[in-house]
């Protein structure tokens, strides 16, 4: 539910975020915005949504990032995650947006280049590459499957609010 949402501008990219998502200071210079997405009833963890921007030519292409995100999730039965990932391309307010949605055990590095990895079973990753005239923005939401499913309508409204000015 999108109630009392707020609009933010980041170097030309604007979006409207749900009021239920709480902002927090970015943990690194690669992150331009971070949100805590409140946990669903019965879940022990909140989800998080992070927006990354690496400059006009940084961050790699859409497919490389989608593949990297897919590889951050493992299937409990050992089957290939790539076969279960849902990918899509669409245009939102004139911007090319590539999305991926995948569930499983979240095993991303705890920080770039770290030897330690998360081990979060029953997690879901929803991510998007938003291509703008000033370079791509990378949006990634991760959290317990139930929490991310509950946040899905707000996430979709958030994506459709993206504009570049």
Residue ranges of predicted features:
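N-terminal helix-cap/turn-to-beta initiation motif at the start of protein domains
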Residues: 9-16
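Solvent-exposed, acidic/flexible segments
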Residues: 42-44, 58-63, 119-122, 144, ...
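Surface-exposed amphipathic alpha-helical segments
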Residues: 19-21, 133-165
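Solvent-exposed coil/turn segments that connect beta secondary-structure elements
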Residues: 54-56, 103-107, 134, 144
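Signature of long, low-cysteine stretches enriched in small and polar/charged residues
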Residues: 19, 30-32, 66-130
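Second-shell loop/turn segments in exported
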Residues: 50-59, 86, 140-149
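Sec-dependent N-terminal signal peptides
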Residues: 1-7
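Secretory pathway targeting signatures of secreted, lumenal, and periplasmic proteins
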Residues: 16-76
């Amino acid at each position: 539910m999108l109630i009392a949402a707020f609009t933010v501008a980041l170097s030309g990219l604007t979006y409207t975020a749900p009021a239920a998502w709480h902002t927090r200071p970015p943990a690194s210079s690669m992150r331009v915005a971070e949100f805590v997405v409140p946990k669903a009833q019965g879940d022990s963890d909140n989800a998080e949504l992070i927006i990354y921007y690496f400059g006009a030519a940084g961050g790699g292409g859409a497919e490389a990032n989608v593949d990297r995100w897919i590889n951050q999730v493992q299937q409990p039965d050992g089957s290939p995650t790539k076969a279960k990932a849902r990918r899509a391309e669409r245009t939102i307010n004139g911007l090319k947006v590539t999305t991926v949605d995948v569930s499983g055990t979240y095993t991303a590095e705890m920080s770039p280049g770290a030897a330690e990895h998360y081990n979060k079973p029953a997690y879901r990753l929803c991510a998007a590459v938003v291509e703008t005239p000033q370079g791509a923005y990378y949006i990634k939401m991760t959290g317990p499957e139930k929490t991310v499913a509950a946040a899905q309508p707000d996430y979709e409204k958030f994506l459709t609010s993206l504009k570049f000015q």
